[in-house]
């Protein structure tokens, strides 16, 4: 069986399980379940702390896993990213007292508090910045006021917590993170490469289904090329004859976020009977 690590709690957990369900895999119904077997797909799911998943995968104990890119890099293990999954986006950044710092280079010789010491040490080493990293398990915003650090490196969403602590973001982002599918560096160790490929294709199908819709419309033959420029599809739109030989029916995949704009432009061009359908699953 393919052995897959899934986050058991936190912001990654619910979205990861939802995506796997959309990909056709059975998921747990009770949050207390730690292991679940899906015999129809010959796969076994292990629900683990997100921070531990990269460790289990990197050591080859489990074949693949879903975790955050930031947690993967912070673990400093022999695991690699296979596929970005498009949810749980976050940005890892520097912050310090208002007016104290303008760039990462000014951190030379300073103390930096973080919950991601592995990730931060790697970033500093790549840029030749010599700073002391102070690992904290949480609430790093308080470390400067308490005299533990001169600045911090942490995941930033709105920045409101930093402002309340009298701090501001500075420098370029350290890392832009999101949920990712990972495996042991160099591939799996138990002959499950084919099963991993199937998992990747299914997850890619979910990503495409979430990002695109199917658009159908009727248009006069002489306007097909102009219409196709608006709805090029992934390779090419499908064009079918209608009973009225002056008209054709067109079907194409279009980006979901552009649906209404494209419909308006098609209508202005002369298209009629414009319909939009959701995509529940696909293989590209």
Swiss-Prot record:
Annotated transmembrane regions: none
Enzyme Commission identifier(s): 2.4.2.17
Catalytic activity from the UniProt record: 1-(5-phospho-beta-D-ribosyl)-ATP + diphosphate = 5-phospho-alpha-D-ribose 1-diphosphate + ATP
Activity control mechanisms: Feedback inhibited by histidine.
Localization terms from the record: Cytoplasm
GO BP of this protein: L-histidine biosynthetic process
Keywords, ordered alphabetically: Amino-acid biosynthesis, ATP-binding, Cytoplasm, Glycosyltransferase, Histidine biosynthesis, Magnesium, Metal-binding, Nucleotide-binding, Transferase
MF annotations from Gene Ontology: ATP binding; ATP phosphoribosyltransferase activity; magnesium ion binding
One GO CC annotation: cytoplasm
Associated pathway: Amino-acid biosynthesis; L-histidine biosynthesis; L-histidine from 5-phospho-alpha-D-ribose 1-diphosphate: step 1/9
Record PROSITE patterns: ATP_P_PHORIBOSYLTR (PS01316)
Gene3D superfamilies: 3.30.70.120, Periplasmic binding protein-like II
Cofactor(s), by name: Mg(2+)
Family assignment from sequence similarity: Belongs to the ATP phosphoribosyltransferase family. Long subfamily.
Function noted in UniProt: Catalyzes the condensation of ATP and 5-phosphoribose 1-diphosphate to form N'-(5'-phosphoribosyl)-ATP (PR-ATP). Has a crucial role in the pathway because the rate of histidine biosynthesis seems to be controlled primarily by regulation of HisG enzymatic activity.
Protein name according to UniProt: ATP phosphoribosyltransferase
Organism: Pseudarthrobacter chlorophenolicus (strain ATCC 700700 / DSM 12829 / CIP 107037 / JCM 12360 / KCTC 9906 / NCIMB 13794 / A6)
